[in-house]
Amino acid sequence: MYTLDGHLRYGVPDDKIWDSIAGRYTEIAKSLGLSIDIDAELRAFAKTLGKNTDQSLLVSRGEYFCARLMSAYLGFAFVDAADVIRFSFDGRLDLETSARLVREAFDSHGSLVVPGFYGAYPNGDIHLFSRGGSDITGSYLARFLNAEIYENWTDVSGIYSADPRLAKNPKPIERITYEELRELSYMGANVLHEDSILPVQDCGIAINIRNTNEPDNDGTVITRDAGEGTPVTGIAGKKGFISFVIHKKHMSGEIGFLRKVLTVFEGYGINVEHIPTGMDVISVIVLEEQAARHVHAIISEIESTLGAQVTVDRNLSLIAIVGRNMAGRYGISASVFGIFGQNGINIKVIVQSPDELNIIVGIDAEHHERAIGCLYDGLCTAGLL
């Protein structure tokens, strides 16, 4: 749909793209023997397409038409997300209104199919969640209806203790806590959108990640208390970070210095990920995609207003070692550092959360794939994972 939007926006012929999209929905309806006249709906929507078609409306139609087919297949009522998932004009989800509308729809129909990924402003215009936002919609629906469990069906059999593309035969995780999953999801374990966890976590609703292609596989269950297990639950990593290394003598005694530094990044709309510190140096780690256009301006502002010297370390990869059972266990950090040392991988950043739920190390991105594979093997050999 994004490709189609681009063609429409710039006046590039788009008939083949739309025919391919529409043909896929028609094929699914026919193969399942559905009575719904999806062709008529697709033709009606096609007539509205043009250069000024709202992008959010267009992009949301993928989920919309999928939900139309699913509701026909299951025999459940179709409820458009635009009618029940409401946003205020500043883009924030209107929890109270959405909860009321969802409950009213459920009370009226009993069984519902609601497309994910989008909702609507008070005036009816479509607003999208971020990419992967169908997970978020499902989570809020479970919350609004006080469900016992939120089953998220995807194309993998739950969560693995490391990326299967980088580690050899990683173990599947049977049970994991909400907090552990948020850490792993944020750091690159993209099975479930990290923003889909909090809505059900607040209510104690369990999440079960299942594989559509292997329905008998129990997958992974996410709960408040996942019980005992190995010290390390899983590892995940992400490339694309940049570190602004800020030097100034006696900065540790300068009240408000760190606040002033963070204010600079806030002014450019950049989220700060981590802040390792020393007596006369701090490192501000951010996503490079957020900072790329502002690097020189940030350096200039910090140096001119704070009297500091700034260097930049690009192409940084962060790897997170996550485990609810790491707290109070000695030797885990030593094992991690030893594994990297034995494999000739230099650690440039070390961060640990106060609750000892994670250990994050920063390395040169060129070693990212090898580092995760080595780390997984080493932790398993040590009996820590």
Locations of regions flagged by a protein language model:
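Short glycine/serine/threonine/alanine-rich loop segments
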Residues: 76, 147, 205, 270, ...
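Short hydrophobic alpha-helical runs that function as membrane-insertion/retention elements
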Residues: 149-153, 207-209, 273
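Glycine-rich beta-alpha junction loops
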Residues: 156-158, 205-207, 211-216, 226, ...
